[in-house]
A protein has these predicted regions:
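Phosphate-binding loop/pocket of nucleotide- and phosphate-handling active sites
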Residues: 1-14, 238-298
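A short, basic/flexible loop-to-alpha-helix module at the beginning of a structural domain
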Residues: 2-31, 218
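Hydrophobic/small residue at the entry helix of a nucleotide-binding pocket
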Residues: 37-38
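Glycine-rich phosphate-binding loop and adjoining beta1-alpha1-beta2 segment
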Residues: 50-93
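Conserved SAM/SAH-binding loop
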Residues: 102-110
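ADP-ribose/adenylate-binding Rossmann-like module
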Residues: 120-161
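Oxidoreductase and adenylate-handling cofactor-binding alpha/beta cores
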Residues: 162, 229-244
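A conserved mid-domain beta-alpha-beta active-site/ligand-binding segment of alpha/beta enzyme cores
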Residues: 170-224
Length: 298
């Protein structure tokens, strides 16, 4: 069957102008990490009519991915996420040129390689060091990057332009202005762990296991992942069209889907700082105690 582009995206027109839709058709977007946020984003950009899509991931789908990741299905277990994302997104955007890249992001050069030629980047990778590497690569390549994450019941989305505030600066990463040494990588992972515990809405029993390293997974839900993806793709549309209000740093979206309201980044930052100081000063058990105190629990 032949698919007519104009007919397939025709109902976008009215919210988008034909001229804006043509820009979208000629735009290349790189989605790095197509597990949770990235899988939902891949479908959304295809449905919106983006003509050139790069999907990047090193992993294969497994049974536990089903709770969060759109393309984790009974017939995709053991298959690479990038290749599956390419096939699935093509069903929603048959006119799109979709490239799958099976690659682990272990350096800024790796990050640059998977984003060459892109006009926009949506970063949905989980690893703290890889997120910093993606941020640095985007600035070197002068490509706007949207950092998106679903963290328990909450989501965070922020947009970073080449001449604006970087993700590292926006989130006060310990790597800012430093080489990504093993020691800095350890600090990044610790801060990420504390931040996740501070914001996610985990149960106290899970937090104790999470801090002690007794669980091999981070607890996720599908609904926040889809919401974070929606917000990320929406950022790209606003950047392209100039419509609406973007979340360009120092702005950012931190939303609580459990209580349906925005979270105060300063409050989250102070909570994270207190727990970090406790962990670094007296160890994990003190960090757990401080987490409970900051959550109003005994």
């Amino acid at each position: 069957m032949d698919y007519n582009y104009e007919e397939s995206i025709g109902r976008n027109i009215g919210l988008l102008t034909p001229e804006e839709q043509e820009i979208i058709r000629n735009t290349t977007i790189s989605i790095v990490g197509v597990g949770g946020v990235g899988s939902w984003a891949a479908v959304m950009v295809a449905k919106t009519g983006f003509g050139h899509i790069i999907v990047v991931d090193k992993d294969e789908y497994e049974l536990p991915n089903m709770v969060e990741q759109l393309f984790a299905k009974t017939d995709t277990f053991g298959k690479t996420k990038a290749e599956v994302a390419k096939q699935e997104a093509a069903k929603h955007g048959p006119f799109a040129n979709i490239k799958a890249v099976v690659k682990d992001i272990q350096s800024v050069d790796d990050a640059k390689a998977v984003c060459q030629g892109a006009d926009y980047i949506i970063c949905g990778v989980d690893d703290a060091v890889a997120r910093v590497q993606m941020d640095r690569a985007s600035r070197e390549l002068r490509i706007p990057i949207i950092m998106a994450a679903n963290i328990g019941w909450r989501i965070t989305v922020s947009t970073h332009t080449p001449d604006g505030i970087s993700y590292e600066e926006h989130t006060h990463q310990p790597s800012l202005g430093k080489e990504l040494s093993p020691q800095i990588a350890e600090s990044l992972h610790l801060q990420q762990k504390v931040y996740i515990a501070s914001i996610a809405g985990f149960t106290p029993a899970y937090v104790e296991k999470f801090f002690r390293g007794e669980v091999s997974y981070i607890s996720y839900l599908a609904v926040p992942a889809a919401f974070a993806a929606s917000a990320a793709v929406n950022e790209v549309l606003k950047l392209i069209t100039g419509k609406g209000k973007t979340n360009i740093s120092p702005n950012g979206l931190t939303f609580d889907m459990l209580n349906m309201g925005h979270l105060d980044p300063k409050e989250i930052g102070m909570r994270t700082y207190r727990i970090m100081q406790a962990v670094m000063g007296k160890g994990i058990e003190e960090g757990i105690k401080t987490w409970k105190e900051t959550r109003g629990e005994t």
